[in-house]
């Protein structure tokens, strides 16, 4: 009997301890585990292929489109659909984003349908006005949009393809259509919108569109394309948001100008591929988080950002306020710097130390190119241009744990009177090293031997 009482007491104690370990409110239902949802492209697209004919069976117009669609899948790889309820249901962000993307694709399809109907009216009138001999040479009108290229990053998708219209002319009209979509916000990206966001480079006065435009112009110059372009082609390039399409792929951003924008129609669309290393730091931190960019590309992007800072001391002038009066110091004129909150030497040093070591920052500041006066920062006018004998530059990142070194290789060129142009100098390879440590995935350089 005594043994039985001991056993019952032990069981009672165990049950009471278990009850204390988990406090359950019977009035509240158990919260189900949240399923992990993912956004994927569907196998089936939004498509249409239709022929519109005259009464005699002649094809007047062909309309065709093929547009991608998104859907949401569960962890069990089943298509997600929101629960049916008479009350308000919180729709998951992933589902809302997929709906927003599909709505834009439907809008593009509807716009093509409307354009096709207008073109069909023109085609009927055109065909009706032809005699029998002329009808023998009839070529149908066309409206097409085929978006068949896709690149999906962790938080962003880009889709692009070609549009084609023919309204009875000697040739049709080709165009590039592209969309880049933020899967986390359900919004489409624009160059204007990206330009408006603060970034590492925008704090230095370098906008995204200006960075991209300069990269495009460098490619045109390197490939000798300018002689085939319209005289005012550069003005269109500097207004990228209004004149070009863009999309992201696994290597960078692609800027595309439709035919007849910067070059004659016969030259077709002009496409420029710009690696992430050239513009990554001109993107805001949110957009950076959407992209799967290799660490080496980020480090080389840090080189370009730091080169901008270096140039303020050894090559050019930082952004200045042209309307502010200059000041005299050390026998020379200094102009008011226009860098937002960077108004003192201490603030400038803090900015430098985000990118280079304290020792290197102090070395640059010791050049005397910046002075502080009455709570404002001033810089000496120092534009001297770049080294035009540099022919090519390439970069390789070598790692040693969380630190490393950028290895820069440059080749030289020289002027040739016979050809009237620069020619490469054989055996002119020169190597420069840029040692760095990393902080939050970005480089902090301890040496910057830029050959300018």
Labelled PLM ranges:
Residues 16-19:
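C-terminal motif of bacterial Sec signal peptides marking the signal peptidase cleavage site
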Residues 21-295:
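Compositionally biased intrinsically disordered regions enriched in Thr/Gly
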């Amino acid at each position: 009997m005594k043994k039985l009482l001991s056993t019952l007491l032990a069981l009672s104690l165990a049950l009471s301890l278990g009850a204390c370990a988990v406090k359950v409110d019977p009035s509240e239902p158990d919260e189900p585990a949240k399923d992990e949802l993912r956004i994927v492209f569907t196998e089936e697209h939004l498509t249409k292929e239709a022929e519109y004919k005259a009464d005699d069976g002649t094809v007047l117009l062909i309309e065709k489109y093929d547009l991608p669609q998104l859907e949401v899948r569960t962890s069990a790889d089943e298509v997600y659909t929101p629960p049916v309820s008479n009350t308000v249901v919180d729709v998951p962000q992933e589902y809302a984003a997929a709906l927003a993307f599909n709505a834009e694709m439907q809008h593009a399809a509807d716009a093509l349908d409307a354009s096709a109907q207008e073109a069909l009216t023109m085609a009927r009138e055109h065909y009706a006005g032809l005699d029998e001999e002329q009808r023998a040479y009839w070529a149908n009108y066309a409206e097409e949009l085929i978006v068949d290229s896709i690149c999906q990053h962790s938080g962003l998708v880009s889709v692009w393809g070609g549009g084609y219209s023919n309204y009875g002319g000697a040739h049709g009209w080709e165009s590039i259509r592209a969309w880049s979509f933020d899967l986390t916000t359900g919004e489409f990206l624009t160059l204007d919108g990206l330009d408006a966001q603060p970034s590492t480079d925008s704090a230095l006065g370098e906008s995204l569109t200006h960075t991209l435009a300069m990269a495009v112009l460098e490619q045109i110059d390197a490939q000798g394309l300018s002689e085939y372009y319209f005289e005012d082609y550069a003005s269109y390039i500097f207004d990228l948001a209004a004149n070009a399409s863009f999309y992201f792929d696994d290597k960078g951003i692609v800027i595309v100008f439709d035919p007849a924008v910067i070059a004659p129609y016969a030259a077709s669309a002009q496409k420029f591929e710009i690696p992430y290393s050239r513009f990554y730091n001109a993107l805001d931190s949110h957009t950076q988080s959407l992209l799967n960019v290799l660490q080496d590309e980020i480090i080389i992007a840090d080189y370009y950002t730091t080169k901008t800072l270096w140039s303020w001391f050894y090559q050019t002038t930082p952004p200045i306020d042209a309307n502010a009066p200059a000041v005299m110091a050390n026998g020379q004129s200094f102009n008011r710097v226009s860098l937002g909150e960077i108004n003192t030497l201490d603030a400038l040093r803090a900015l430098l130390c985000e990118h280079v070591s304290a020792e290197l920052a102090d070395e640059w500041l010791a050049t005397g190119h910046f002075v502080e006066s009455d709570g404002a920062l001033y810089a000496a006018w120092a534009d001297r241009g770049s080294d035009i004998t540099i022919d090519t530059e390439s970069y390789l990142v070598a790692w040693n744990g969380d630190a490393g070194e950028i290895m820069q290789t440059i080749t030289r060129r020289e002027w040739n009177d016979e050809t009237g142009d620069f020619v490469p100098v054989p055996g002119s390879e020169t190597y420069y090293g840029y040692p760095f440590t990393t902080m939050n995935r970005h480089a902090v350089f301890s040496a910057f031997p830029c050959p300018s």
